[in-house]
Amino acid sequence: MMLPPKYDHRAVEANRYEWWLKGKFFEATSDETKKPFTIVIPPPNVTGKLHLGHAWDTTLQDIITRMKRMQGYDVLWLPGMDHAGIATQAKVEEKLRNEGKTRYDLGREKFVEETWKWKEEYAGHIRSQWAKLGLGLDYTRERFTLDEGLSKAVREVFVSLYKKGLIYRGEYIINWDPVTKTALSDIEVVYKDVQGALYHMRYPLADGSGYIEVATTRPETMLGDTAVAVHPEDERYKHLIGKTVILPIVGREIPIIGDEYVDMSFGSGAVKITPAHDPNDFEIGNRHHLPRILVMNEDGTMNDNALQYKGLDRFECRKQIVKDLQEQGVLFKIEEHMHSVGHSERSGAVVEPYLSTQWFVKMKPLAEAAIEQQKTEGKVNFVPERFEKTYLHWMENIRDWCISRQLWWGHRIPAWYHKETGEVYVDHEPPADIENWEQDQDVLDTWFSSALWPFSTMGWPDKTSADYNRYYPTDVLVTGYDIIFFWVSRMIFQALEFTGKRPFKDVLIHGLVRDAQGRKMSKSLGNGVDPMDVIDQYGADSLRYFLATGSSPGQDLRFSTEKVEATWNFVNKIWNASRFALMNMEGFTYEDIDLHGEKSVADHWILTRLNETIETVTKLADKYEFGEVGRVLYNFIWDDLCDWYIEMAKLPLYGDDEQAKKTTRSVLAYVLDQTMRLLHPFMPFVTEEIWQQLPHEGESITVASWPQVRPELSNHEAAETMRLLVDIIRAVRNIRAEVNTPLSKPITLYIKAKDEHVKATLETNRAYIERFCNPSELVIDTTIPTVEKAMTAVVTGAELSLPLEGLINIEEEVKRLEKELQKLDQEVERVQKKLSNEGFLAKAPAHVVEEERKKERDYIEKREAVRARLAQLKQ
């Protein structure tokens, strides 16, 4: 039983994961005597490396599943990956471009083959990163959103929704990327503030009686205008509703319509309506049966409807049309305008709201069922609860979901068109006379298949599947608040529609990982952090513990190397404490552990504190309060176990009483064993390493039972005594620090006990006071002599007096403190002068002002302490 002198995370973490996998500790057992507990991993995209957000998300899941496994559940944590349509296709196309090829050179079939090769390579990278993090995944059940089982589920859902009239093909305004030439989901659109312009134009009334003013940021779209809208209650324009204007350049007559969507107070109160190029205009167009005129091609160039501008790029057209409108006197004002413009996350192109024929899911009926579910006992519990409002707000304001994508990589839409009649055929399998039909070229939005993830991974649509019947619905989903709408909501309504059950009981929401300044991590800022680099430098246990305990549910997490380093120091502390314990357990076995012997006050206290810690940690973990769990474990391990109990245990361990030695070893072995178990879900590698060296039974800590409170081991009276001893020792240490006296220098110490009971208690535990206070003379009584020139302290149940005569040069100390007081007076004056300066308060950033206020508080506090010390010395 021995640990190396220095903690080396690389040595500790090497080969351990393979050992766990070999032992099959992470595999679900289907053991009917155990209650099942299920989490499905949010499948990462097979596009490359996992980032810190993934590391955080999966660490939280690993903590939950490791804890449940130890609590005796049959745990299934199902791994898998997402084919990530556009993201993966973009990567493979980039690879081909570097080779001087395009996907069209390969053709669809060969391109898809190339993408599968990419998937195999990057899936391997992801698995190796999961291994580095120590994730307890059941790889025997790993799934991929494009594997055969999931493809079957996707076809089943598409066909079923189509036959119910909930999937339809129609025209709609979608986010269009003119570079990749595909529709984008909202999450693939990144909004950036752009300095543009607002172009003010006058459209002449057809009857020659005047004009109406409109403004736009996209003048090139005016070629597709089919109306001008005003608010029906707007007194300025009421009389114009029903009249027409002449569309400049085009010469088309378009109506003036009344619609309540128009904001009377914005701009002129009149709005040009282009139903084919704006989602709000599209809705207005539908209400007023306006024609939809598309003026662009899929590549962002102008089409035939753009007349003389045909063939121009949209931005070139903008320049030309502005020039022409100015010459005609139509465009009368251009003002600078900062506005938010959508860009494609993949290509960087400005996204075009674009009228397109696409496949859609009719969302209202599905959303209504999900909203109703939240009013029942079988609702999905959001943690923190406030995110339920976010979810319901989205569901109540939902629009139909565009599910088709103009890509080659993904689930091909199971729809065929008859080559002659144009008839549409939708089914699980192609039509029998396939030669007369052509399949839809599009694939489904990636979110369509990932929305089925909780049940498609369990064998659905085969409702007799053993896994589906045992492990579905799942228990917890862990995910970020940024995809509540894109993913969480879709999983809920699809699960309710197809399984009649909620897909998970709880949704644990975390925030985003930000840098130390609170900025979002991004390529442009260059502030991204690779979790594998952190693991290499500090180990997986340090990174995991920091990620898990660094914030509370729903909050963002600020990443800081200093904090990871502090955690690494904590792991070192645990290592050194365990090493000390093991050095004193030579030949001590699991069978030797005996907690029935006569225990010291320190033994009773640490066992009581252990019980309290087990109870608190278990309760907090059940509520997903991992930040609080971290604080409780840190305080127990660092303060109670390492700084106090182990130091006190040295008395019997180095003494001659063999029975006391055996009891101390037993307590130390038991407490360390239980502590490793509590810590294991957070720090799996180091706890397994230490636990294997400790006296133990069982093959691995991963399957050891979760600690239980043992009331018979608690002794609250002893715990109170220990608190008194700790208070006394701390008070003496503080006095020594104040008067600059090292522990090696003996002192005289008088302790006045408040009553005979306290006196007797302190006498019984005199050895601890002598060991940790180093008094040359120790007097414990209910009355003590009054000593001039003494440092005093009051603790609950006792008063301490430490004579200074012979300990320090009082005259010198008074001089030193007076000098220090003078300096502190100057600092207080300086900082208060600064804080009373109106100019400073107005101009300085808030954090700088707060820093100065903190300095003021600190200086005043120090000054009071110095004054008190001087008063004591001068008495």
Swiss-Prot record:
ATP binds at K523. InterPro entries: aa-tRNA-synth_I_CS (IPR001412), aa-tRNA-synth_Ia (IPR002300), Anticodon_Ia_Val (IPR033705), M/V/L/I-tRNA-synth_anticd-bd (IPR013155), Rossmann-like_a/b/a_fold (IPR014729), tRNA-bd_arm (IPR010978), tRNAsynth_Ia_anticodon-bd (IPR009080), Val-tRNA_synth_C_sf (IPR037118). It comes from Anoxybacillus flavithermus (strain DSM 21510 / WK1). It is found in: Cytoplasm. One of its GO terms (biological process) is valyl-tRNA aminoacylation. It catalyses: tRNA(Val) + L-valine + ATP = L-valyl-tRNA(Val) + AMP + diphosphate. Belongs to the class-I aminoacyl-tRNA synthetase family. ValS type 1 subfamily. This is Valine--tRNA ligase. GO terms for molecular function: aminoacyl-tRNA deacylase activity; ATP binding; valine-tRNA ligase activity. A motif ('HIGH' region) lies at residues 44-54. It is an enzyme of class 6 (ligase). Pfam families: Anticodon_1, tRNA-synt_1, Val_tRNA-synt_C. Its EC number is 6.1.1.9. A motif ('KMSKS' region) lies at residues 520-524. Its main location: cytoplasm. Catalyzes the attachment of valine to tRNA(Val). As ValRS can inadvertently accommodate and process structurally similar amino acids such as threonine, to avoid such errors, it has a 'posttransfer' editing activity that hydrolyzes mischarged Thr-tRNA(Val) in a tRNA-dependent manner. ValRS has two distinct active sites: one for aminoacylation and one for editing. The misactivated threonine is translocated from the active site to the editing site. Residues 804-875 form a coiled coil. Monomer. GO terms for cellular component: cytosol. Keywords: Aminoacyl-tRNA synthetase, ATP-binding, Coiled coil, Cytoplasm, Ligase, Nucleotide-binding, Protein biosynthesis.
